[in-house]
Amino acid sequence: MKRSSSMLDINEDSQHSTNKAPPPKKAPEDRFDSANMNASGSHVTLVENLPVEKVSSGERIAILDFGAQYGKVIDRRVRELLVQSEMFPLNTTARTLIELGGFKGIIISGGPNSVFEPEAPSIDPEIFTCGLPVLGICYGFQLMNKLNGGTVTREHIREDGACEIQVDTSVHLFNGLHKTETVLLTHGDSVSEATVAPDFKVMAKSGHHVAGICNENRKLYGVQFHPEVDLTTNGTKMFENFLFKVVGCCGNFTIQNREQSCISEINSIVGDKKVLVMVSGGVDSAVCAALLRRALGPNRVTAIHIDNGFMRHEESDAVEKSLAALDLPIHRYNFGTTFRSSTEHCKDGEVALDECDDPEMKRKIIGNTFIRVKDVIMKDLNINHDEYFLAQGTLRPDLIESASALASGHADTIKTHHNDTFLVRELRKLGKVVEPLKDFHKDEVRELGKDLGLPESIVQRHPFPGPGLAIRILCASDKRPELMFNGPMYNGDVQGRIIDVTEQFLNSAINPSQGIYEHLQFEQARNNVLLSLSERDRQLAEQQTFQISAHILPIKTVGVQGDARSYSYAVALSTEQRPIPWKLLFAYASVIPKLFHGVNRVVYAFGSKIEFSIEDLTRTYLVPHIVTKLQMADHIANNILFGRVAASDGTQLPNVGHKIQQMPVVLLPVDFDRDRDMIGSYRHSIVLRPFVTSDFMTGQAAIPGVHLPEETLIEMDKAIRTNVLGISRVLLDMTCKPPGTTEWE
């Protein structure tokens, strides 16, 4: 049955309630105390339509943006060190920078492209001869080598994740560091010692790959890794060395504090009109609402909360209570049926949300339905469109991952965010959207929330995506899935599995009849992987005696590899070994995506060793009983995480929620250990994704016994399988970001 995408009957599915807040309190007087502003308070960027007042420091760093997912983090790292930075498009010439004046150095970002592509972006070669110090990162490093006479080669084995490299500490960039450093590598193209540009020397190595080159006389430095992210342990020190020892900056850049900048922007955009803000109850939308109230007063801000049918257990009730602290009336609407029945056009015609199994289409339907529902609510509240702006708590990572022009005209799309869909972008073009946090990262928003006086319960709340549980349910039809792989490790279409990972590291027997190693023999692949490991991991791999089983799951998840989006398979590891060999399992999780380019996520399956391959999936769509199943599992897992319930043996569980930054709970259409005589798959599995990060651009999967108590996770496994009907297995996501994103979709 065809269903109209404009079916938004407010009487069909909506329950409108208004939380009448107490009389608004007088906001404290706004003050700007530059003497007490910390380093992270400095704030400058060249983003379209962002009127931020700048105070010139007399020294600036130019960042040439090649579309790196971490491009904005580079800008942030420089600002944290009190040096002014400005972002420019990749085609900016050296002459332009010289004529603008005031630039003391240049940083070239990474990017999603390969230097081998026919139309791969390049830069003005005079960037390297203009006399300014240059730091090239990832793709910028490869261009530095190529444009100075070296070459770059395409590798069979990717490097994606935290790796140990050896560095020359006599080089200015690495002064004060250890000879072995942990860094984030994410690339498939490489430079070897034989292909380094003339007059450049190797200053860092990762196995047999070159991880850094330099010409100190010309003050040119290039690194294959990403020093701007948290996974590079001493990346800030590297930026400090470049800015102060190489470039000669003083670090005297100060500007208005964040709060004042945001308030100034809100007032300049809104003028004497009003704002409608959609509030989810998360920290981003709460801080956005608090800023709007501070800038405009409560009478010019209308806050609404939309229950789209995919909230967590009793989430909307909790939102109403927590947002009362903002002294804003909250208008609550329930639109579950409307969202489920909303449709969008795709290549196969029109698809409804509750019949959709494509993750990108799900996000687009939800994002666009939010905008259409907003119009219905404005009519219900007698709001004049011409008198109101739409406000969103959009963050910088949202825009970067959606490849929005606000963040970078060249960033590769990782996933479409519900607050950055086509309709939202159209409203931006009309100047009708206010996004005061669009230049902020999550940790910066928390700091701003504290400055605004928001309660700890809101400021430290774990993030929850706007589309809700809809993107934590991986949907599937009952059509038999086909495993599809590309690359030198595979020969055409592969319907198979990894059978064993045993005594030798990754010495697995993958169905030889499929001819997987026609282009690359296993032993060569294994040796290449071992070369990329640290000495500790190599010893662990070669000495282990555990029996571990590995199975490819016929489902795809979103990831980021080489600064670009990946949509690849997950691998499930299992073992009979007790205690569970976590160190070894996490070593596998790091290496498997390097060996198998078609894999971007690795999970551990609690319980016994998996015996059978997964040959079909459970029919799964966004219908009420499926959503309820995930709501129950999520509620159980979070109660255990925050110590709200006792363990199965009656002992009190500790509150360990503060030890991680987020824990998505995901439902998979996968039925493990199914009776082979059963006609079809009917159960689901649950994934726990505890995640440790400071900026959500990169991060580490929480390790049992290190970040979280093992007994907490084991208790989650027991409680979910006991109390939620139709659950086959509970899995632990062991994947860092990259190669896996925080969310699975």
Curated annotation (Swiss-Prot):
Gene3D superfamilies: 3.30.300.10, 3.40.50.880, HUPs. Coiled coil: none annotated. GO terms for cellular component: cytosol. Keywords: ATP-binding, Glutamine amidotransferase, GMP biosynthesis, Ligase, Nucleotide-binding, Purine biosynthesis. It catalyses: XMP + L-glutamine + ATP + H2O = GMP + L-glutamate + AMP + diphosphate + 2 H(+). Residues 253-461 form the GMPS ATP-PPase domain. The active site is at 138 (for gatase activity), 226, 228. Transmembrane segments: none annotated. Homodimer. This is Probable GMP synthase [glutamine-hydrolyzing]. It comes from Caenorhabditis elegans.
